[in-house]
């Protein structure tokens, strides 16, 4: 069942197209008089206890099947060559099946910046086992309640999740990132996570891979919930009050360097990409994908130069305009 389900996730992730992307409702104000040379632009950022050379990473996607193994090897090669973080999909499949080697990418990519992922439904003992076996630089702990509810074989008991989060925060020996899975993390959840000691979250909003869509494609039911959750930019707007206390990572529908920059303008420390990179490795050779990702770095620098920003922190000073749903939501937030 696990193998079939993981391969279905890949298939349905690749086929879905979102009719709305919140990044299109943000317009950045161009600066006509430049302040910096292009070679002065610094892309480095800091989160999860370390400095990173680039403000984007390959986010958790897959594992637990032969197809997942093939994809993970390609993604690991891209990430290692480009010097960016790669986070594997949920390690739960390997915990259930010790012979599953679909997550074993470090031996063939020794310089890889590797993260891994586990669900908050799993007790901390399994999180500790995951860290021991994978030796990651960070551990994503994902929350996916709507996905679980839509899965015929999904979890139905959730009372333990908060105590699990407290345990993870206290006992896991590497930095943890509390991660949504495409439904947009709300401010109250960030507040509760902060109380438990969490200092880094991935908001992962609607607009990219929809696990509601994926599970409804698998079961053929409840497709009216396919657009459940908050869009990525909406989740980021909602989290503004927390950006000085909690490191905000952002993912969900990020398509290109301009989308990345828009996240960074609103205080994100870094930006995760899943389906965009998955589509690339399924369409082009690994060498071609490496060239594309390296090009993203150059594009980030030129956009920052045109905005008069020498550092990632400078981007938070950029003026912007909001349109459509984002503007309406921000106006409502002002009145609340």
From Swiss-Prot:
One of its GO terms (molecular function) is NADPH binding. CDD domains: IDI-2_FMN. FMN binds at residues 60-62, 90, 117, 179, 204, 209, 253-255, 274-275. It catalyses: isopentenyl diphosphate = dimethylallyl diphosphate. It is an enzyme of class 5 (isomerase). GO terms for cellular component: cytoplasm. The keyword Acetylation does not apply. Its cofactor is FMN; NADPH; Mg(2+). Its main location: cytoplasm. The keyword Cytoplasm applies. SUPFAM superfamilies: FMN-linked oxidoreductases. GO terms for biological process: isoprenoid biosynthetic process. Belongs to the IPP isomerase type 2 family. Involved in the biosynthesis of isoprenoids. Catalyzes the 1,3-allylic rearrangement of the homoallylic substrate isopentenyl (IPP) to its allylic isomer, dimethylallyl diphosphate (DMAPP). This is Isopentenyl-diphosphate delta-isomerase. The gene is fni.
């Amino acid at each position: 069942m696990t193998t079939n389900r993981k391969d279905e996730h890949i298939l349905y992730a690749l086929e879905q197209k979102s009719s709305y992307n919140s990044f299109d409702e943000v317009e950045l104000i161009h600066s006509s008089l430049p302040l910096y040379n292009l070679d002065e632009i610094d892309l480095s950022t800091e989160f999860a206890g370390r400095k990173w050379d680039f403000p984007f990473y390959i986010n958790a996607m897959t594992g637990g099947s032969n197809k997942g193994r093939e994809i993970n090897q390609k993604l690991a090669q891209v990430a290692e060559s480009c010097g960016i973080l790669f986070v594997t999909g949920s390690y739960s499949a390997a915990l259930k099946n010790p012979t599953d080697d679909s997550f074993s990418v470090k031996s063939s990519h020794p310089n890889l910046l590797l993260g891994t992922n586990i669900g908050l439904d799993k007790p901390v003992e399994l999180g500790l086992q995951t860290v021991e076996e994978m030796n990651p630089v960070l551990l994503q702990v994902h929350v996916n309640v709507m996905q679980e509810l839509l899965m015929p074989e999904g979890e139905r008991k959730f009372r333990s999740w908060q105590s699990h989060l407290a345990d993870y925060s206290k006992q896991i020996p590497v930095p943890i990132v509390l991660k949504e899975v495409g439904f947009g993390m709300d401010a109250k959840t960030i507040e509760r996570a902060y109380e438990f000691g969490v200092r880094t979250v991935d908001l992962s909003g609607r607009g990219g891979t929809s696990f509601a869509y994926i599970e409804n494609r698998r079961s053929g039911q409840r497709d009216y919930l396919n657009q459940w959750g908050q869009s990525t930019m909406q989740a980021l707007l909602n989290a503004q009050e927390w950006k000085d206390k909690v490191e905000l990572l952002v993912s969900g529908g990020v398509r290109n360097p301009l989308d990345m920059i828009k996240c960074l303008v609103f205080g994100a420390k870094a930006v995760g990409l899943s389906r965009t990179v998955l589509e690339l490795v399924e369409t082009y050779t690994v060498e071609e994908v490496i060239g594309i990702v390296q090009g993203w770095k150059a594009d980030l620098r030129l956009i920052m130069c045109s905005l008069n920003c020498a550092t990632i922190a400078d981007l938070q000073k950029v003026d912007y305009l909001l349109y459509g749903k984002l503007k309406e939501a921000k106006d409502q937030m002002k009145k609340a």
